[in-house]
């Protein structure tokens, strides 16, 4: 299978890798679409402070389930899914308080661990989300859209109100 490897800052190449095998409780996914986030650009440029090399970037994606290792009453081969791209330890102070976004040991796909710029990848079933009826192209952007949705909800913006977008770089554009 092919993957995009950022070998060193500023250098990327398409490489052939062995297809991964899902562990028990994991699914093998075929990536359908992958978005390019600002963190992917930072990883390529060498300005992402947490990236190590070589690294396969990417965390915004949609995929089709190819195979499931084990039983699942939620998913089947052929389902189109996306996934939570952040892996928390669940035991640190932040996680115990429900603040998983502040996990002391977070591993983000494409930064701390290989990401979605590859044809196939494995993912724990408990991280997957089906989105029946959603176009896979749109599903690949659910993570950046959810950030905007969260901001609007948190600010309690009401219909008809105006908002100002204070910053719109390539990282914030959808």
Give the ranges of each region predicted by the language model.
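Residues that mark the start of a beta-strand
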Residues: 2, 26-28, 162
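NAD(P)H dinucleotide-binding glycine-rich loop of Rossmann-like/cofactor-binding domains
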Residues: 89-164
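Cytochrome P450 core scaffold surrounding the K-helix E-X-X-R motif
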Residues: 39-42
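Glycine-rich beta-strand-centered segment in the early N-terminal region that forms part
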Residues: 20-34, 47-93, 132-134
């Amino acid at each position: 299978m092919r993957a995009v490897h950022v070998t060193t800052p500023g250098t990327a190449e398409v490489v052939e890798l062995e297809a991964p095998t899902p562990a028990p409780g994991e699914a093998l996914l075929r990536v359908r679409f992958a978005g390019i986030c600002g963190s992917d650009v930072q990883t390529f440029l060498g300005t992402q402070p947490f990236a190590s090399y070589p690294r396969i970037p990417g965390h915004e994606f949609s995929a089709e389930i190819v195979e499931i290792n084990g039983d699942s009453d939620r998913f089947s081969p052929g389902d189109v899914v996306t996934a939570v791209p952040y892996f928390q330890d669940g035991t640190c102070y932040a996680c115990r308080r429900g603040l998983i976004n502040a996990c002391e040991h977070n591993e983000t796909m494409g930064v701390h661990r290989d990401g979605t710029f590859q044809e196939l990848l494995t993912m724990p079933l408990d991280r997957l989300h089906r989105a029946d009826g959603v176009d896979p192209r749109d599903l690949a952007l659910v993570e950046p859209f959810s950030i905007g949705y969260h901001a609007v909800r948190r600010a309690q913006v009401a219909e008809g109100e105006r908002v100002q977008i204070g910053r719109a770089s390539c990282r914030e554009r959808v």
